[in-house]
Amino acid sequence: MKIRKFFTLVSLSALVLTGCNKENQSQFEKLNIVTNDELKKERNKEKASLYLDSARQSLQDVSALWTNREPGNHVFSPASYLVAWSSLLAVSSQTDAYQEALCISDPKAERLGLLSSLNGIEKNNWDDDQILTSIKTAAFYQQIGNKYAFDKKKQEKLASEYVDSGVTDVDHYLSQAQEYFTEKIGLKRQIPEVFPDKDSVLVYGGLTRKDNADLGKRSGAFTPLNGVEKTVDAVPIGNRWGTESFEYYKGENYQRRSLPICSTSLEVILPDEGTDLKDIDIKKAYLDFKENACLTPLYGYVPFFKTEERIDLTTIADKVNSDCVVFCSELLKDDVKNDLGIRNVIQNSDFSFSDKGVEGESITIMEIGSARPQKHPYTEFNVNRPFYAISSYGSLPLFVNQIVDPVFN
């Protein structure tokens, strides 16, 4: 199975890491979004607690838009702004403001840890034969701007931070990006039209690639919503003795299970039979799970799947916070703050979930049972109806997915 992970870095104003200009302050306050002044109050306290609260709040703010959408598979990313911010740090040596504001002792390690997670680096030790699996990583794509013009030194900084990177001009970005992905990264993908501003620069980057990703694959029989059983490649969860335990929580009208995927986890929220998907309060389910989940034994397989959907997250952000342009101000030094003006970015979500990780929109069908009787009872978890899935990095929700029609890859 070819890796198909695709990153578009967007400004989703439901999650704000930095300051905003005064005229937009009241709009941010209405949504309980973290602003520069609030972050200052949080210094030398618990690590970025307001920042995480803002991410959780965004689950409610943005998912409310789904009530007006046609039924179907949808995705949004409350963490998109964080990814954009992390990429800025890749081309700037000015990390002290970031460190001070979020109380992070090693911002470079924090950023690289996040980007490594998003790019699917994984190491699995199998007890059977001690196989070490290093999963192939993916490239990401971004357009930040209406102006994205890092100077030469900053472009060189980007190239040194990643194993490989490329910068294209606007007029030829499609052909240049295709050449970059094919020849340098080794991925064949269709580069989307993003209609960039003429003053923009498009940046592409990739991390280390490993080609022994097939070592962790297994096969399993799964039954999608159409009722036709299908045998597909899958990534194991737990182990064949069923001795590993993962977080599980039974809510008022749903159950929720956390599944480790690479450095991230996929947390599936499955409504009870007869419960409409929209009757689930995502934010409450998220917080209840974090506070009350219990470890239960688990063994099974998660199949590979993929969907494609084009989403304009700029439009979504405008609905949440109309006419608000998010930009860096006091937290950045003068020589870098003008490099980040995040506007009008289209996300083209070509999403896949596999042993490489989770990115974009998730569709999962899953059956889990025990290999033999255990001291602790198993929780059988069958995803045979519409559900939510949250891809998380620690306690930070990266992608929230509404799945109505699961489709195998």
Task: Say what each PLM segment does.
Residues 2-10:
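Sec-dependent signal peptide recognition
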Residues 271-296:
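Internal alpha/beta scaffold segment
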Residues 99-102, 218-224, 279-288:
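Short Gly/aromatic-enriched secondary-structure transition segments
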Residues 71, 88, 111-272, 295-373:
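Non-catalytic, conformational "gating/processing" segments within enzyme and secreted inhibitor domains
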Residues 7, 20-167:
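Detector for small/aliphatic-rich hydrophobic stretches
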Residues 253-269, 374-409:
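Extended hydrophobic
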Residues 94-99, 277-278, 309-311, 361, ...:
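Extracytoplasmic/secreted cell-surface and envelope-processing proteins
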